[in-house]
Amino acid sequence: GSTQGIIDYNGMSISLTSGRNGPGEIWYDPTRPAVNQAATHVEGHAAAIMVENQIREMTITINNRNGPCGNCMRQLPERLPQGYVLNVRWLDNKGTIRMTQIVGRGR
């Protein structure tokens, strides 16, 4: 099924689902498959929310036991402004909470 994600920000919980429809569609480009994959994943939707609302740091917890995919890790730093940080948390196959950061280096 689709990856689900929950953002906790300012006492609000926002639920996201991977797919074409969502905040990440601002980056959707049919000619760039790697960008599209990142734009349609929950991490891409979260990154788009950060950009649209000028949120410099945010945490999303996802239900994918493998963590963020390679395309998200490669494509999203260019789409987040310099210094923005998206923390991605997940539970791995051993039940351990893991976390990685997607750090913005865009303009």
Residue ranges of predicted features:
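Catalytic toxin/effector domains delivered as secreted proteins or via bacterial secretion systems
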Residues: G1-R107
